[in-house]
Amino acid sequence: MHAFFLLVFLWIAPGVLAQPATDTVASSSLPALHFNGQLAAWSGVQAAAVPVWMAGGRFVPTLTGSSKPGGRAVWDMETSLNINGSLGWSRDSLASYTGRIKPYRIWIRYSTSRFELRAGLQKMNFGAAKMLRPLMWFDGMDIRDPLQLTDGVYGLLSRYYFAGNATLWAWALAGNHRPKGYEWVGTARLKPELGGRVQLPAGPGEVGISYHYREADPRNSLIAGAAQYTRSSLAENRMGFDGKWDVGVGLWVEGSLTALEKDRQLLLPTRTDMLNLGMDYTFPLGNGLGLTLEYFRYHAGDRFFTGGAGANVLASMASYPLSLIDNVSVMTFCIPSPGRTLWMNYLSWSRTYDQLSVYLIGFISPEDIALPVMALQRGSNGFAGKGIQLMLSYNF
């Protein structure tokens, strides 16, 4: 609550202090506040020998504001909460229940035509891939989630936009000790994370190079037994690259290399490499059939590219608008492996009005296997096994 009032004050203060000492204040420089948000509810069932029913809800109230005290520069802000709860039950028992209230976004931004600086709890993502993203460093978005909600990170992000369409990013993060993205190990407390990114035009597209440094705390790990580890900090360097081009069809490449400081006591992989190759195209059939294809490789071990363990995933997504408000889509993930090929299949229908959206999702997947990215997401897997889910979302 103290952070909320501090944020509002920091946002209002520049506008107030910049006003002339007169009784009349120009209306264009007055802060403008808007309250909106999203309310969602869902229910579903996972078919099994004993079916498991699920129900849940989420409320994301959001306060936004903007002010233009100096004529050219803009101050704006956003603060929101994530209020959510869910239940899972079978015929004769309560399988699970969760409930939580936490900050979702709390940030303030200063921006001009070429520069912006944003501070606070914010969403940070970049890259070209659509379904399986090697550059998912700071978020946890799941392509199967119709709402596309994800936790943010606390930090400072600056971006400068050059005249030739190049963009320079720089960031400093702090207070994000829990594992995020693909991380197996959380970040050491009171240790800042630093990084940057350059995006450059490249013919009919663009390319990007990204770097991130942090000090990981091996005691804060998703692996059981890590709390017994003695060291509290290990250096980690991360490099990323991506490019996308429109040459009639959309083409992209995205990859990431992560090197964690080696230690004899460490039982975790110290090298991780990921690669995504993808394409998309809209076929002129009926209202337009959109098709997306991706190849994704995930590998972790003591060396890059060889040894250790890994997975190859073939992903496809087809989408077709039945009308102005109805859409159907199919997603398929294939994981080839010796002796067994795993398939994950999702069929969804959506209807979108001005403020209300309805989603109906059917899925057939292994009950005990998840994609590499999905396996790292904390919480239950609501799309495991066979089942169906209905979701309503209202935006106001």
Regions of interest found by a model, annotated:
Residues 61-67, 105-110, 156-160, 196-200, ...:
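Residues on the lipid-exposed face of transmembrane beta-strands in outer-membrane beta-barrel proteins
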Residues 23-48, 75-79, 166:
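Transmembrane beta-strand segments of Gram-negative outer membrane beta-barrel proteins
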Residues 356, 364, 380-396:
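Outer-membrane beta-barrel "beta-signal"
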Residues 51-59, 99-104, 150-154, 190-194, ...:
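Residues that define the transmembrane beta-barrel architecture of outer-membrane proteins
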Residues 244-335:
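Detector for outer-membrane/organellar transmembrane beta-barrel domains
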Residues 41-47, 65-67, 81-87, 112-114, ...:
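Transmembrane beta-strands of outer-membrane beta-barrel pores
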Residues 33, 71-77, 114-117, 165-168, ...:
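Repeated loop/turn-to-beta-strand initiation elements of outer-membrane beta-barrel proteins
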Residues 66-168, 173, 200, 367:
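Outer membrane beta-barrel
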